[in-house]
């Protein structure tokens, strides 16, 4: 199964709403057998346990982007997703 990177808004307007949206899209694509999703929004839980500077998370995201077969940009403004 191909690996899909899902990018989109995280903090604006509400992190919980945005994380929920990204997870739901990922679930649908996975359950249809289309992609194995990588959802960087879920690092919010990791960050709650081990806070790191934003550059740390961007570095992790860039490594994952190199390995993904496809990229999906969710609608909405996002400085990080558009970087």
Model-identified regions with their sequence ranges:
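Catalytic phosphate/metal-binding cores of nucleic-acid and nucleotide-processing enzymes, i.e., regions
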Residues: 1-83
